[in-house]
Regions:
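Conserved SF2 helicase motif VI
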Residues: 412-432, 436
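Conserved pre-motif I regulatory segment
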Residues: 80-124
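Post-DEXD/H (motif II) to motif III coupling segment of the RecA-like Helicase ATP-binding lobe
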Residues: 222-286, 457
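Conserved interdomain hinge at the start of the Helicase C-terminal
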Residues: 301-339, 345-350
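Conserved Walker A/P-loop ATP-binding site and its immediately adjacent core
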Residues: 132-134, 141-143, 147-170, 341-342
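Walker A/P-loop
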Residues: 118-140
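Conserved helicase ATPase core of P-loop NTP-dependent helicases/translocases
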Residues: 162, 177-188, 345-346, 357-394
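A short beta-strand element within the Helicase C-terminal
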Residues: 388, 397-410, 435-438
Length: 472
């Protein structure tokens, strides 16, 4: 058995390749839909992370090697000398830097040490665990030994560019850092450039220097999808020192393999449950409210029943009154996550009628500066209802003074559910518990999606209770 370097990938040469490939594969659930209309008969194909000729992404090396050691303990294997500097580009002399404005928690210090030991890889910290402070410490550790270092941090959106930049200012990092957005040009003399995905996608080909940076950091790295441009950009950046940070990896195996393949193995993992046990995050209770309807949308064969169900629940007066009653009786700040603009607009109109509540709707057209003002209002007041598009507020938003989060649009996404819960887990002096309200519609798709979310709660070790509300 042999591992050899093949340009930008690694090749596994073995008589047992077919068996190993099969282990690192899953059934292709989309094959049926892709084949529809092309052929009457088809065989269920699989998605593999190792090609038929044994090629795979360098970041998967340790996972594949671990499997081989376990399943083939008596088999000798040979690894080309050129491979180790790629899969483990270790920093030999650096020490973890712990002299920022805020001292590192033990697990943050441990994660930085692992990053320095491996030189690349993924740090998984439960949402609210302090990823930005961890990044700052890691980069200060590298800068202390190389004052000329060039670093690129990729974040999902404009809001996180500003949030990361402001956090670095607050932490008193010593390296020079700058922002790069559609409106802000980067200072190329800086050690560290913080950029959102959008600007990189549009400007990557015109800025060849990006390919030659020393260190790449991808924040919220679970957002790297096989099909998006960021995934391809990460491959084109030559450095082997690539790090990813996230609260959770994709539940979909091929997408998970893609992230690991690009950045490296998971080098540190401390999930939300562990952080809650150790009192780094607040406790959480989930109240699943099963809503039964007097009249239900008609299920018609061949039509878009899912869309019809969404239209039904978003415009249903009984359901919206349930939301209004819960919010009016809750005495602290609430975050209501919606998936569709029209639903958010309707809720904004309804909830704005509640006395003694400040109501905001954060959607795509709301400028980043205004979003920041709303966050500050929430941090300093206790009478705010913030309706937000989940695509905006499910990732990377840091507001400690949230006491209740409502899932008002259902859905079954593993990552979005976990990340959304994380919006309210950060500690706050006025909060001893986060309340999650999960609206579960007793309809065809609503029931299916609710069951998926309950599976997620169980996997995350979060208690939930069930309550029925029936329209009469």
């Amino acid at each position: 058995m042999k591992f050899e370097l093949a340009k930008e990938k690694i090749r596994l040469i073995t008589d047992d390749l077919d068996y190993i490939r099969e282990y690192f594969s899953v059934k292709d659930e989309t094959a049926r839909f892709r084949m529809r209309g092309r052929a009457r008969f088809y065989s269920n194909s699989r998605v593999y992370c190792i090609t038929p000729t044994g090629l795979f992404e360098p970041g998967l090396f340790f996972d594949i090697l671990s499997y081989i050691k376990l399943e083939y303990p008596n088999t000798d294997y040979q690894i080309d000398l050129d491979i180790l500097p790629i899969v483990k580009p270790v920093y030999k002399e650096e020490r973890a830097y712990d002299n920022l404005k805020f001292p590192l928690r033990d697990y943050q210090l441990d994660s930085v040490r692992e990053a320095l030991k491996f030189g690349r890889g993924i740090i998984k910290l439960g949402t609210g665990g302090g990823k930005t402070l961890t990044i700052a410490s890691l980069l200060m550790s590298l800068y202390s030994n190389n004052p000329k270092i060039k670093i690129l941090i990729i974040v999902p959106d404009l809001g996180l560019v500003n949030q990361t930049y402001n956090d670095f200012l607050e932490y008193n990092v010593l390296f020079k850092f700058t922002r790069w957005t559609g409106k802000i040009k980067p200072d190329l003399t800086a050690n560290c450039i913080i950029a959102n995905r959008g600007i990189l996608q549009s400007q990557f080909d015109n800025n060849d220097w990006i390919k030659y940076i020393d260190v790449l950091v991808v924040d919220e790295c679970h957002t790297i999808k096989k099909s998006n441009k960021v995934s391809k950009m990460v491959n084109k950046i030559h450095t082997f020192n690539k790090f990813g940070l996230t609260g959770t990896l994709p539940d979909d195996k091929p997408e998970q393999w893609n992230v690991i393949g690009k950045l490296g193995k998971v080098i540190y993992d401390k999930d939300s449950y562990q952080l809650r046990l150790e009192s780094y995050l607040t406790n959480v209770d989930i109240k699943v409210i099963n809503i039964g309807y007097k009249d239900k949308p008609l299920v018609v064969s061949g039509s878009n029943n899912f869309k019809a169900e969404l239209d039904f629940i978003y415009t249903n007066n009984f359901r919206n009154n349930v939301i209004k009653n819960i919010c009016s009786k809750f005495n602290n700040n609430s975050l209501i996550l919606v998936n569709h603009l029209a639903h958010g607009d309707a809720l904004f109109d309804d909830l704005s009628q509640i006395d003694n509540k400040k109501v905001y709707f954060v959607k795509g057209e709301v400028e980043v500066d205004k979003r920041e003002k709303i966050k500050k209002i929430m941090e300093t007041n206790n009478d705010v209802i913030c309706i937000a598009m989940s695509s905006i507020f499910s990732t990377g938003v840091n507001i400690k003074n949230i006491h209740m989060i409502m899932f008002a649009s259902g859905g079954k996404s593993f990552i979005r559910t976990i990340q959304s819960i994380g919006r309210g887990l950060r500690l706050h002096e006025s909060k001893n518990k986060l309340i999650i309200i999960d609206l579960a519609d007793k309809l065809k798709y609503g029931t299916r999606h609710s069951e998926k979310r309950k599976e997620i709660y169980k996997s995350e070790k979060i208690n939930f209770t069930l309550t029925d509300i029936v329209e009469k």
